[in-house]
Amino acid sequence: MKAQELRTKSVEELNAELVNLLGEQFKLRMQAATGQLQQTHQLKQVRRSIAQVKTVLTEKAGE
């Protein structure tokens, strides 16, 4: 999701998105640890998405 789209969401929606992404990251990390993850680029994408959501939350907290 693009940062501009994230900025239009409310804080509650962003927190829900963050929880969802953290759960997805956990599942991907477990798959990678057991050798089941074929598309390793997903880890990078999820990590980047988490950073984007956290950045937007910090911006909203400063407003």
Curated annotation (Swiss-Prot):
A single Gene Ontology CC term: cytosolic large ribosomal subunit
> Entry's Gene3D superfamilies?
1.10.287.310
Q: Name one GO molecular function term.
A: structural constituent of ribosome
Question: NCBIfam families of this UniProt entry?
Answer: L29 (TIGR00012)
Similarity comment text for this entry = Belongs to the universal ribosomal protein uL29 family.
Q: Which HAMAP family match?
A: Ribosomal_uL29
What is the name listed in the Swiss-Prot or TrEMBL entry for this protein?
Answer: Large ribosomal subunit protein uL29
